[in-house]
């Protein structure tokens, strides 16, 4: 009788063991972009020391990582925040979900000509990103700086139509996010991404008049997966290494300086 009662438990244990073995048999494949690659490389190296094999795949654009993940060519990607993910899902019908938080890259407002927002003249030009996700973040920054006022509650979905006050009559110019670094020389105020400013090595990434941060948690970069991968033990182990390894934290500090915050600590 006891033998019959315990058989289902044994069967479940064997099944779970087979599932775990199936996950562990292959290296974990992670897709990313250049801005996040170096700290991930440190995590891959640390994972190897702990017996977890990981393959890092670097993409040159922001579309392929989600296409590859959705098709199952990779197991997880790490390059996007929630607004970007939601926009991509709406546009392409991806079945993807956030798995765990990474870092938030502080985004700033930079000026080559002025040292404070008070110095901005009437009609000053302001360059922000032209895509729906990053332009909303730029407008939120301008509102935080006090140079414009937005309708209450619009958040990252803000557009220029949501500006209810613009006392300096700022001229907002929308340009491609990757071109914002170049706009620094011409515009009076520019939305800037420190990770890409550092890559371009064109001006001091720490020189922003204002940064955003964890008050906008929706911009924390996420480890993103397909829903069926949520119980993959390789994911849990790798994320734990990324979030808690001293070697990875040192790599993050070297790559981003003090221009990032740990999303899992906020």
Which positions does each model-derived feature cover?
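Pocket-flanking alpha-helical
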Residues: 62-94, 108, 115, 197-202
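Short, polar/charged alpha-helical segment
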Residues: 33-55, 64
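Short, well-ordered beta-strand elements
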Residues: 25-35, 52-58, 125-126
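Short helix-initiation/N-cap motifs at beta->coil->alpha
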Residues: 56-67, 154-182
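Periplasmic-binding protein-like
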Residues: 134-143, 242-263
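A conserved helix-loop-strand patch within extracytoplasmic ligand-binding domains
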Residues: 99-149
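Ligand-binding "clamshell"
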Residues: 87-99, 112-114, 186, 191, ...
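A bilobed periplasmic-binding-protein/Venus flytrap-type ligand-binding module shared by bacterial periplasmic
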Residues: 106-117, 219-234
């Amino acid at each position: 009788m006891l033998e019959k009662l315990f058989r289902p438990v044994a069967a479940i244990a064997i099944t779970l063991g087979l599932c775990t073995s199936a996950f562990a048999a292959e290296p974990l494949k992670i897709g990313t972009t250049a801005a996040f690659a170096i700290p991930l490389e440190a995590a891959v190296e640390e994972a190897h020391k702990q017996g977890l094999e990981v393959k890092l795949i670097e993409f040159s654009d922001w579309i392929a990582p989600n296409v590859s993940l959705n098709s199952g060519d990779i197991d997880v990607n790490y390059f996007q925040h929630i607004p970007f993910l939601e926009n991509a899902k709406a546009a392409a019908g991806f079945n993807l979900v956030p798995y765990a938080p990474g870092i938030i890259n502080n985004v700033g407002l930079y000026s080559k000509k002025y040292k404070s927002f008070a110095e901005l003249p009437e009609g000053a030009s302001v360059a922000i990103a032209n895509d729906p996700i990053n332009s909303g973040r730029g407008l939120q920054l301008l509102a935080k700086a006090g140079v414009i006022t937005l309708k209450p509650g619009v958040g990252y979905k803000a557009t220029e139509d949501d500006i209810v006050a613009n006392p300096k009559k700022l001229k907002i110019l929308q340009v491609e996010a990757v071109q914002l670094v170049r706009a620094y020389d011409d515009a009076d105020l520019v939305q800037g991404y420190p990770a890409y400013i550092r890559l371009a090595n064109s001006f001091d990434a720490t020189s922003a008049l204002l940064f955003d941060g964890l008050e906008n948690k929706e911009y924390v970069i996420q480890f993103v997966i397909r829903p069926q991968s949520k119980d993959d033990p390789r994911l849990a182990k790798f994320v734990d290494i990324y979030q808690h390894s001293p070697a990875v934290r040192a790599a993050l500090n070297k790559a981003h300086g003090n221009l990032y915050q740990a999303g899992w600590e906020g």
